[in-house]
């Protein structure tokens, strides 16, 4: 009997309060609620975790030994579970070899298409390659060389050095009499050899005959022997005209003699030695020594540190060698680098085969010392390739510059792989097309194929079109197959995985998604909802953790977790249909039914009259745009996904300002010039990267408030009597921490073939500190008790300590009152990490001339959280600062003082500034997609 519901009973994970939930199977369910209310705890840490645990329990004990920790979630019972697949936001793949094409497997089908239906061309002459059977070669010779004397040759050596004495002797013993060396036919003699230092072309003479029809059997036999001897390739030499013609069983260019092996899918893979460019090994880029970084100041002498990797003069062999080289050119180590002759610099950098003489008095030997000098570049390269020392590699990396591979020009593949075409494009050109352009190419390319290839390609093209359509449906038309996975945003990588899952056509699966609408313009939201419904209609259950209003209204079922966040959340405040939800009064329902709303400001700020102007920005898809950022305003940059917003702000504006203000090493994308940069004195880029990589990092340590809290405890009477220093109250150093667990508060128990178990430390019971440290108390609370407080509790507790209150109050103001002061940074979402960073900046004194940059700060935020966040940002602008936000959320866009709309499309169809002005001015514009969705929000 099949169950119609997924039933969760007694869920207590994190802040969930023993809740019971029912979710209908084969439906689209949205789990919503305030940030920190417990949505992810229910969806991922309870339902998904239990589904995974049950799946792994079906493995043998031996197989389970190789899998990660799968603890049973704290729940009484879950019934009705299907196999579960989680599609999260995290961009987990940092491998430079992973691309959109490899992730979606579209590139695999492209490789198959080019291997089976591609036409080969010579990369030397550009002519179409041909291949011959032995029968065809015999027929051509009888027709075209009738009555002529010809030599039938097998190529043995092509443009290689060597004396080839053994080869000649081997041919002589096989009974061959003549050989052609560098165009000259010679008799093979005993001991024969050629100049070993020159490149040679060598062919063995298989037969020489007058071509007549009566000799066709002899000709046939000679051609077969020649093909075998020449590995499928032969040459016909016309004795009278002294011209040769090439024939091959393999693909060959008759004019140049160039031949390829039969194409196979691996030949088009940049991850296979058969296809990868030999110079960059399939990466498309190479790391090379940048001489500008090695010698930044040519006015210095080598003795004073002109060559940065070597530093200033030391009594070392490398300096003695360089000095000996310089003396040959009338210079020494004290000569300014700019005055050293070019020949000497070339030897110092690249080395020389000629030995360098070092005077015996320097090396303290009985005679002069002779040694070859390999050069500074070789020295740095050796350090860089030293696998045993990560520190040395990191040190050497600072002198590298990444550039396009000079051999494949960024195409990643060998020359012969790029010489195959389908239609009029090679595989790299196809992979560089936007998905929308690729879709057009796929729909027309079949008509350009030869009849035989058309039949072969039909099924492959059909599969390619299907998979490309799935990417179009989830709003990723602006990406290309060659786009690296590591460069994708969390929302983009999630939607790629969603498209892959739709393409897999699985049924009876439970899919759980985490905010798939992140980074999507309202235009593309409709496509996403359609894709999720398609996944449901295949016969699957889809659970989405989401705050988007359109997604909630399109759902079959809604579970609202609340009423507030943290300890005040963790309850089911509503479960039912969207229609029924509108009749309730939960915080979410109030925003959906119009009882609550974020009000449109009555007046837009005028700013301070100053601005920053960037002219000629042309990074990625930007089309030499000029853009002005009026200061003292809340600026929102809008546009569809892939239109160029992040390129303009994160890759152009932010690096320009950082270079000017802080001498940042990050290079901005190309632009012509910038004006007004002196109108600000500080730039703060608040991104969503983690605030720490280890469980020891937490909001208290990141904001710096933990230092103040430790100082407070050090100055307590009990601490002074005991002579404690601030380090006593740190869980990172010996002294005050619990040594049984090293200040972690827990221990990891290895269970061999069972998953590792994390248990609270039996000595400190999770407190992280030893007994003596915990005896020091402030207002009855130990340092461990303080770290266990939520931000809201800490604000009340430290209300009379101004320096501490200021920092934790800022965390409360950005809507993080529910998280704990000592909560591990690894448990914070990207949105929470971003708000911790924002709170840290808020607690600092601003100058009134600061520019703040935020990329989608509403990620993971409920309507109510957005209202709180925007109140904070509004206060920053009210103090004279400028806030630049990249955002799709209409509640944020309508609050802007100034909008910069980028578009009109994504990818190559974008990159233009299509409208700027107040929300009211942009809303009445006829350009782009933003006005259509903004008008109703403003009541226009």
Residue spans of the language-model regions?
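Conserved phosphate-binding elements of NTP-dependent enzyme cores
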Residues: 1-940
């Amino acid at each position: 009997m099949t169950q119609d519901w997924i039933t969760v009973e007694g869920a207590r994970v994190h802040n969930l309060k023993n809740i019971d939930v029912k979710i209908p199977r084969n439906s689209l369910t949205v789990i919503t609620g305030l940030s920190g209310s417990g949505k992810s705890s229910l969806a991922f840490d309870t339902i998904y975790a239990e589904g995974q645990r049950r799946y792994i329990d079906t493995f043998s004990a031996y197989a389970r030994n190789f899998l990660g920790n799968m603890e049973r979630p704290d729940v009484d019972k879950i019934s009705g579970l299907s196999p579960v697949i989680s599609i999260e936001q995290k961009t987990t793949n940092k491998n430079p070899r992973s691309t959109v094409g490899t992730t979606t497997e579209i590139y695999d089908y492209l490789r198959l298409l080019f291997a089976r239906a591609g036409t080969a061309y010579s990369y030397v002459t550009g002519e179409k390659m041909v291949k011959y059977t032995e029968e065809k070669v015999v027929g051509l010779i009888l027709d075209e060389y009738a009555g002529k004397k010809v030599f039938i040759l097998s190529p043995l050596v092509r443009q290689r050095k060597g004396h080839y004495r053994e080869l000649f002797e081997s041919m002589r013993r096989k009974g061959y009499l003549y050989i052609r060396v560098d165009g000259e036919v010679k008799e093979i003699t005993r001991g024969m050899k050629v100049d070993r230092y020159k490149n040679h072309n060598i062919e063995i003479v298989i037969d020489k005959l007058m071509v007549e029809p009566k000799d066709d059997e002899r000709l046939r036999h000679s051609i077969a022997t020649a093909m075998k001897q020449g590995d499928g390739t032969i040459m016909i030499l016309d004795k009278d005209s002294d011209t040769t013609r090439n024939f091959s069983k393999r693909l060959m260019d008759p004019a140049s003699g160039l031949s390829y092996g039969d194409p196979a899918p691996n030949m088009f893979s940049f991850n296979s030695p058969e296809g990868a460019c030999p110079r960059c090994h399939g990466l498309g880029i190479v790391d090379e020594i940048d001489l500008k970084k090695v010698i930044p100041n040519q006015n210095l002498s080598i003795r004073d540190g002109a060559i940065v990797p070597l530093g200033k003069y030391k009594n070392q062999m490398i300096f003695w060698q360089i000095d000996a080289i310089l003396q040959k050119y009338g210079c020494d180590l004290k000569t300014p680098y700019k005055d050293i002759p070019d020949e000497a610099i070339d030897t110092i950098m690249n080395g020389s085969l000629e030995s360098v003489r070092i005077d015996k008095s320097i090396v303290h030997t009985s005679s002069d010392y002779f040694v070859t000098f390999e050069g500074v570049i070789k020295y740095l390269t050796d350090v860089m390739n030293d696998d045993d020392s990560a520190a040395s590699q990191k040190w050497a990396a600072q002198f590298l510059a990444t550039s396009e591979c000079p051999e494949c020009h960024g195409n990643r593949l060998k020359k012969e792989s790029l010489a195959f075409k389908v239609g009029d494009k090679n595989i790299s050109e196809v992979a560089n097309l936007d998905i929308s352009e690729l879709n057009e190419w796929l729909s027309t390319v079949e008509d350009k194929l030869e009849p035989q290839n058309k039949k072969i390609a039909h099924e492959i093209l059909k599969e390619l079109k299907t998979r490309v359509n799935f990417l179009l449906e989830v709003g990723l038309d602006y990406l290309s197959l060659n786009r690296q996975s590591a460069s994708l945003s969390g929302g983009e990588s999630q939607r790629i995985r969603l498209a892959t899952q739709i393409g897999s056509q699985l049924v009876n699966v439970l899919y759980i998604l985490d905010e798939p609408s992140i980074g999507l313009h309202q235009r593309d939201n409709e496509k996403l909802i359609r894709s999720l419904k398609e996944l449901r209609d295949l016969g699957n259950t889809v659970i989405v953790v989401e705050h988007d209003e359109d997604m909630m209204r399109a759902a079959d079922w809604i579970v609202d977790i609340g009423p507030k966040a943290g300890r005040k959340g963790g309850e089911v405040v509503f479960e039912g249909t969207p229609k029924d939800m509108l009749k309730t009064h939960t915080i979410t329902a109030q925003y959906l039914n119009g009882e609550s709303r974020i009000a449109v400001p009555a007046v837009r700020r005028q700013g301070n009259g100053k601005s920053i102007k960037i002219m000629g920005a042309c990074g990625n898809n930007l089309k030499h745009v000029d853009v002005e950022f009026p200061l003292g305003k809340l600026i929102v940059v809008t546009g569809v996904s892939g239109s160029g917003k992040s390129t303009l702000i994160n890759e152009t504006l932010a690096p320009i300002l950082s270079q000017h203000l802080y001498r940042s090493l990050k290079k901005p994308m190309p632009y012509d010039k910038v004006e007004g940069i002196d109108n600000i004195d500080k730039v703060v880029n608040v991104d969503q990267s983690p605030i720490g990589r280890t469980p020891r990092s937490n909001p208290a340590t990141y904001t710096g408030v933990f230092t103040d809290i430790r100082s407070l405890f050090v100055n307590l009477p009990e601490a002074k009597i005991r002579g404690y220093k601030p380090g006593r109250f740190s869980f990172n150093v010996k002294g005050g921490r619990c040594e049984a667990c090293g200040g972690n508060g827990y221990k990891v128990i290895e269970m061999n073939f069972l998953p590792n178990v994390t248990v609270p430390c039996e000595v400190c019971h999770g407190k992280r500190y030893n007994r003596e440290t915990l005896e020091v108390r402030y207002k009855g609370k130990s340092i461990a008790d303080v770290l266990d407080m939520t931000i809201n509790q800490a604000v009340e507790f430290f209300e009379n300590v101004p320096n501490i209150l200021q920092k934790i109050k800022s965390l409360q103001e950005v809507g993080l009152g529910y998280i704990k002061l000592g909560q591990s940074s690894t448990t914070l979402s990207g949105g929470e990490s971003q708000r911790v960073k924002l709170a840290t900046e808020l607690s600092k004194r601003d100058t009134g001339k600061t520019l703040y940059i935020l990329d989608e700060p509403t990620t993971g935020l409920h309507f109510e959280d957005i209202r709180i966040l925007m109140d904070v940002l509004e206060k920053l602008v009210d103090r004279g600062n400028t806030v630049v936000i990249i955002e799709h959320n209409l509640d944020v866009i309508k609050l802007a003082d100034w909008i910069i709309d980028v578009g009109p499309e994504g990818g190559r169809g974008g990159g233009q500034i299509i409208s700027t002005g107040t929300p009211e001015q942009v809303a009445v514009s006829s350009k782009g997609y933003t006005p259509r969705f903004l008008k109703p929000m403003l009541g226009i």
